[in-house]
């Protein structure tokens, strides 16, 4: 990740709005959209393809580009061959995320809702917040630039060489990451309200950087029954937290205590005055084999044997 690419959230706050999609989908009265048209919240919760659409903005540079691509996609009825040649790649991307007629109808209504909210409230709010939190963003940038050399070997060995870190107003400990290519990664992390919490985005960066390692550790060590019953999938959030803590302890140990306290707070657990490691480990429990594999892979990525 290139420190120079650290930037504020995408235009119109689209990342924030998509991250809070279930809440946004609930309030569509101003559009004249009734419950008989489509249940946006239910579809978001039930359809994996739709929920993966939260990563859609990471492929674009602006809200206008998202609108252009979705309009072309809907006009083509989801068929890339029916779109203009210059937009076929974008239409194909959308078709992979929203393959059915019902999915396309959901997308049409949702983009309409986002545009309406942006026009009536969110864009001006977003502009004001970017102005108010500029000192925080600058402090985060400075901290990341100072720490990035310590992460460099891990970034290189995990094929996350370059990309952008995007600061978001609404995301907490769970970031959003697109690993399109070794030199094209987009990571969305929290934007704190004050410089007192300047390290929080770095905690989330570490959490996001270990996602692939965490998935490998789970896949290699979960039993067939755990894979079949969905238990293995449930390990993923915890494995990312545990792996992020391991990475932080190796490359920036001075941030280790803060990392654990941050993620305990995110989990609704009040961090103790002392003994935070024990509480952290008991809160984010994993099978021993997965923990050991996480440690092994992180050590290897940092150049260990």
What spans do the regions from the language model cover?
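Pan-zinc metallopeptidase signature
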Residues: 256-305
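Auxiliary, metal-adjacent structural segments of Zn-dependent hydrolase domains
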Residues: 122-183, 254
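Extended, compositionally biased non-globular segments
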Residues: 227-270
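Active-site scaffold of zinc-dependent metalloenzymes
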Residues: 92, 174-209
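Soluble non-cytosolic domains of exported or imported proteins
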Residues: 138-145, 200, 234, 238
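N-terminal low-structure segments adjacent to metalloprotease catalytic domains
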Residues: 1-121
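Active-site recognition of the HExxH zinc-binding catalytic motif
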Residues: 199-224, 238-246
């Amino acid at each position: 990740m290139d420190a120079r690419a650290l930037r504020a959230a995408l235009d119109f706050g689209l990342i924030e709005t998509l991250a809070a999609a279930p809440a946004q989908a609930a309030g569509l009265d101003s559009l004249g959209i009734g419950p008989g048209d489509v249940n946006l919240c239910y579809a978001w919760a039930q359809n994996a393809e739709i929920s993966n659409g939260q990563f859609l903005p990471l492929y674009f540079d602006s809200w206008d580009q998202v609108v252009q691509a979705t309009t072309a996609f809907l006009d083509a009825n989801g068929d890339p061959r029916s779109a203009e040649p210059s937009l076929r790649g974008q239409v194909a991307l959308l078709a992979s995320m929203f393959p059915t007629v019902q999915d396309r109808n959901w997308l049409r209504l949702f983009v309409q809702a986002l545009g309406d909210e942006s026009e009536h409230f969110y864009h001006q709010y977003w502009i004001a917040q970017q102005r108010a939190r500029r000192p925080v963003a600058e402090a985060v940038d400075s901290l990341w630039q100072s720490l990035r050399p310590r992460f460099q070997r891990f970034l290189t060995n995990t094929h996350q060489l370059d990309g952008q870190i995007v600061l978001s107003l609404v995301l907490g400990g769970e970031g959003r990451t697109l690993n399109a290519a070794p030199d094209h990664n987009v990571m969305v992390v929290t934007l704190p309200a004050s410089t007192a919490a300047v390290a929080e985005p770095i905690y989330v960066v570490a959490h996001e950087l270990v996602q692939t390692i965490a998935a490998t550790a789970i896949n290699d060590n979960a039993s067939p029954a755990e894979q079949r019953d969905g238990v293995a999938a449930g390990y993923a959030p915890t494995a990312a937290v545990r792996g992020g803590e391991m990475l932080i302890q190796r490359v920036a140990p001075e941030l280790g205590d803060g990392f654990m306290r941050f993620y305990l707070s995110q989990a609704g657990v009040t961090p103790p005055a002392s003994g935070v490691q024990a509480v952290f480990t008991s809160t984010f429990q994993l099978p021993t084999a997965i923990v050991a594999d996480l440690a092994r892979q992180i050590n290897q990525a940092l150049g260990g044997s």
